[in-house]
Amino acid sequence: MTRLKTDIRVAALLKRAQGSGAFAVVLRRGDADAGALWVIVRQGRDLMLYTEQMVMSGARNWYQDGPFDETEMQLRTNKAVDRDPDIWIVEIEHPHGRPFLDGETAKTETAAEVAAKALFRGQ
């Protein structure tokens, strides 16, 4: 299955968000071809984190985690960059917390929900 390059996906995300009146900015540029993508959504003081994960079918799903304060989010992003220097980080500020993610948004789960499902499946 052919995947769009990350820089193209980020450009589309920025266009969707900014076209709807949200503020969106690239906080960190990663590998243009295949860098992982994290999206931070700011709603007031709350920060939600959306990360992409590849699932067994080969599809990519978004997972939501948070809310976090500024300090916790900075710690998370710093650790992510240390582990993966190719990562992209985009921040979107929207009054209703809309993430503007692409069509792969059908499944959003918190990290705790993912862990619980894995536990009950015996993994």
Annotate each PLM feature.
Residues 1-123:
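Polybasic/polar functional segments that serve as interface/processing modules
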